[in-house]
Amino acid sequence: MRHNFKVIEKKWQKKWEDAKVFEAQDFSDKKKFYGLVEFPYPSGAGMHVGHIKAYSSVEVVSRKRRMEGYNVLFPIGFDAFGLPTENYAIKTGTHPRQITDQNIARFTEQLKRVGFSFDWSRVILSLIHI
């Protein structure tokens, strides 16, 4: 019997999202743990294996802390200004804000599909409104 991993993963990710399993609780009496990864530059066509490698260790520790009963804050964000974004916009001939919004949407979808347990209710953006 073969498993359809795309269906199974999607099902469980939806259940976890609906149950807000990965959201930190404000004013909780539980011990606290703060996990943070370097925010990606949304200045390319998408994630690569380096992103997965860089985030996996903090992902593992964050999940372990949740299982130990900690209130875990593990936000994600996007470092969406500066030369990488400008260079990618010039390369593609697209306005920096438009390309940034498109890439943030793509990165978000990819990070969710991988199954990282980020607190998506607390996304941090380092961009100025353009």
Which residues does each PLM region occupy?
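N-terminal, positively charged nucleic-acid-binding surface of large information/translation enzymes
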Residues: 1-128
